[in-house]
Design a protein with these regions (language model features):
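Short, glycine-/small- and polar/acidic-enriched structural segments
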Residues: 1-109, 115, 128-163
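A conserved active-site cap/scaffold subdomain adjacent to cofactor or substrate pockets
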Residues: 163-172
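Short acidic active-site motifs
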Residues: 121-122
Length: 172
């Protein structure tokens, strides 16, 4: 075991509750980062969302509603569900994607696929069409933009203010 570790905030909670892992009594006395994640989408998904937008394209609610329309059209046409990458099931990335999607009426468990990817694989997975979008921290969103394979749709700070990402976890 460890005395202290840098963890995704939800991992600390999940570990202390025994979710997905052996129960480890830990606490997280320090927050190490806020609001560093972003949602990046492929050029094709960006164009599809923008074609369905009704309102401000920088408003997370407007894009979530547009995403719901894109998802519905894809379902009606028989297309495969959109695939979204995130870093870990017990991560703010996962919860932030779910929160944003659900706000627009997209059921993250039924309407899309959520897959776990290590952050360094996100950009290649987007470029190769393995995912249509991802939620991750720096520098991967900017890398996708610099390479021309992605558009940053939202910074998570636009969706959830003061979203804790990383914590210092210690054994109780």
């Amino acid at each position: 075991l460890f005395d202290a570790a840098h963890l995704l905030a939800p991992v600390a909670i999940a570990s202390s509750l025994g979710l997905g892992h052996v129960k480890v009594p830990i606490v997280a006395p320090f927050n190490l980062g806020l609001n560093g994640n972003a949602i990046t989408v492929s050029p094709a998904l960006h164009a599809a969302i923008m074609s369905e937008i009704d309102g401000d394209p920088f408003d997370p609610m407007a894009t979530a509603l547009a995403l719901a329309r894109v998802v519905a059209k894809r379902r009606k046409s028989g297309a495969e569900p959109l695939t979204f990458g995130m870093t870990f099931p017990f991560s703010t990335h996962n919860y932030q994607l779910r929160f944003w999607m659900a706000a627009g009426g997209v059921d993250p468990d039924e309407d899309v696929r959520l897959v776990v990817l290590p952050p360094p694989y996100m950009v290649d997975s987007l470029a190769n069409g393995h995912v249509d979008a991802f939620c991750v921290g720096a520098p991967w969103n900017s890398v996708a933009v610099d390479l021309g394979v992605g558009h940053i749709l939202h910074f998570v700070a636009d969706i959830l203010v003061h979203a804790v990402e990383k914590v210092l976890a210690v054994r109780q």
